[in-house]
Design a protein with these regions (language model features):
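Active-site glycine-rich loop that binds ribose-phosphate moieties when present
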Residues: 82-94, 114-116, 124
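Surface-exposed beta-loop interaction hotspot
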Residues: 86-109
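A glycine-rich beta-to-alpha transition motif near the start of alpha/beta enzyme domains, typified by
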Residues: 1-77, 99, 106-215
């Protein structure tokens, strides 16, 4: 897809309105392949909420290929759970943690939550996720690369905070995150070390959108 088409579809005035666009393709190594495009047209490696939306769309437990790897999933009518492929801490920094949850996140403790987020995003060329306390549910805010603004509920950002929480509290296997949207998600580690994200997904609408030269 051309970046201009993605930007148009994600535009909240002239298009459908979204933080990103998901394209599904056949896969040779999983049930299907997910490609995720940011609102500016750039392609991202992974999206935690995007993975869960795909499972909701298919209405079954499936394996999903993305640029980040293979994600497992569990489908129920009420909640969707997915794994974040190869999620790990890249490096501990003086200011926080650099973490890969399919996409890179800089995780910082900041009582002001969003202060200097844009600066850190460009200094490190990453998504920036800030938290104000490690008391659960952990309140977070994310400045997303490609969106170039706040994402009200970033699944991979929540996963990054869960990894930082696990690093600080090794005996804890469950972490609940509260997003700026007011929604929450639960993150847990299974016996193999895989990081699972679980939460509710709502079907908002469906329709047909026609792209043409005049759009």
């Amino acid at each position: 897809l051309a970046a201009l088409c993605v930007s148009l579809l994600c535009n909240r005035h002239r298009g459908i309105g979204a933080d990103g666009l998901i394209v599904l393709e056949p896969s040779k190594i999983a049930d299907l392949k997910m490609r995720i495009f940011n609102a500016d047209g750039s392609e991202a490696d992974c999206c935690g909420n995007g993975l869960r939306c795909v499972v909701k769309y298919k209405k079954q437990s499936i394996q999903i290929e993305s640029l980040a790897g293979i994600s497992k999933s569990l489908y129920t009518p009420s909640t969707i759970s997915v794994t974040l492929p190869k999620a790990h801490i890249i490096k501990k920094l003086d200011i926080g943690y650099l973490i890969d949850t399919g996409v890179p996140h800089l995780v910082l403790f900041n009582p002001d939550l969003f202060k200097d987020a844009k600066k850190y995003r460009f200094d490190f060329n990453v998504n920036v996720t800030m938290f104000s306390s490690m008391h659960q549910p952990i309140k977070i805010r994310t400045y997303e690369r490609g969106v170039e603004g706040e994402t009200l509920a970033c699944g991979t950002g929540g996963a990054a905070v869960a990894l930082a929480y696990k690093e600080m509290y090794p005996d804890e296997n469950l972490c609940t995150v509260l997003f700026a949207s007011g929604e929450s998600a639960a993150y847990s580690f299974d016996a193999t070390g895989d990081l699972w994200m679980e939460g509710v997904i709502e079907h908002v609408f469906e329709g047909t959108y026609t792209l043409n030269k005049e759009s």
